[in-house]
Amino acid sequence: MQLTGREIVERGIITNIDEENGIQQQGIDLRVIGIRKLSGGGCMPLFGKTKLPNYSPVEMEVEPERSYWRLEPGYYEITFEEGCKIPSNLAMTLIQRSSLLRCGGIIRSSQFDAGFSTDHMGSFMEILHPVEIEYQARIAQTIVVETAEVRQEDLYHGQWAEQQNVVQRGRF
């Protein structure tokens, strides 16, 4: 069963929520605070840890009224203001908000497994047409579903646990 936005808040699954604008019917909106563009290749070995590709920070345009990223078509790593703490009986994915999709952007999310936790969630975004995205714009939404209980020893303990991305902070 998919949780409602209110249930997600009550269970403390998402942190740093914009409680005024971010709670939706079936999820929580996520605000972007950092964007880096893919600029090299990676390696997925048979054994061992993934070698990540290179990502280059995208500079923010700063105007008196707003701060934003001007994005050209490409593949981007994104960092959100919100964090998460996934309990042992839930899993989560992210999807783009319809406004981003209408502008030619698609969020590419893997599953956030039971036991995963971070102060700032991250995901990936494919941009198909040039677009401007403002700092802290709500571009993604959580989808949290109940699962069978995962045993303590089987909870997520992978290489991305508690990873902190370096993010750009907007200036106003």
Q: Model regions: which residues?
A:
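DUTPase catalytic domain/fold
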Residues: M1-F172
